[in-house]
Regions:
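Transmembrane alpha-helix boundary/anchor motif
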Residues: 1, 33, 37, 73, ...
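Alpha-helical transmembrane segments and their short interhelical loops
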Residues: 13, 17-90, 97, 146-149, ...
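Transmembrane helix boundary and interhelical loop/hinge segments in multi-pass membrane proteins
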Residues: 1-11, 172-173
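Aromatic-anchored segments of alpha-helical transmembrane domains
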Residues: 38, 98-104, 125
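Junction motif at the cytosolic side of a transmembrane helix
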Residues: 77, 81, 139, 151-173
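Central hydrophobic cores of alpha-helical transmembrane segments
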Residues: 91-95, 120-121
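Transmembrane helix-loop junction
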Residues: 40, 44, 79-80, 84, ...
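Membrane-interfacial helix-loop-helix junctions in multi-pass membrane proteins
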Residues: 50, 104-158
Length: 173
């Protein structure tokens, strides 16, 4: 379809990848803002406590941006690696479920067996979740979450770079 036509145009494919990345990055940030808004405004309407944003607002935005970059990079890598949408959707769904389970999204890492606790240290979901927990619950600073921020940015850089390389090797022109 349209991707084939875009590939046939001579020139760099970078704007295509950058455009996709920018769009989905913004979608992630919009989702984050909507979830925060639900916690602040909707939860009290249901008789629940209002979400309190502890920590530094700049650190929360930085963490959300880094999580969005990591998630977008991962999605982009899956999209360019697999040949069909069905393959990408299947792998993406299963891998996200596995990464979230390992990363402590379903079950807190501290109740996992030691081997899984060690494995969870390699999950981007764990890095993001740990950073948000530290910011919201422990009023952490940017300095204290910096190791996870660097990991998330590194993951984003690796996945986006791999996406560009794979995309270039599959370019028709």
């Amino acid at each position: 379809g349209s991707m084939l036509r875009l590939r046939l145009i001579s020139g760099s494919q970078f704007p295509v990848i950058a455009g996709k990345f920018a769009f989905y990055f913004l979608v992630c940030l919009i989702q984050f803002v909507m979830m925060i808004a639900v916690g602040i405004f909707v939860m009290p309407l249901m008789g629940l406590n209002r979400l309190l944003l502890g920590g530094e607002p700049g650190a929360i935005l930085l963490t959300a941006s880094c999580v969005a970059m990591a998630a977008t990079g991962y999605g982009l890598l899956i999209a360019v690696y697999f040949r069909t949408a069905q393959q990408a959707l299947s792998f993406g769904s299963v891998s996200v479920v596995i990464l979230s389970a390992i990363g402590g999204v379903w079950v807190p890492v501290y109740v996992m067996p030691e081997i899984l606790q060690n494995i969870s240290r390699f999950s981007p979901m764990s890095w993001g979740l740990e950073s948000f927990n530290d910011l919201f619950l422990r009023e952490a600073t940017i300095a204290s979450i910096l190791p996870n921020i660097v990991r998330l940015l590194g993951f984003a850089l690796v996945t986006v770079s791999a996406s560009v390389i794979i995309h270039k090797t599959r370019t028709v022109v």
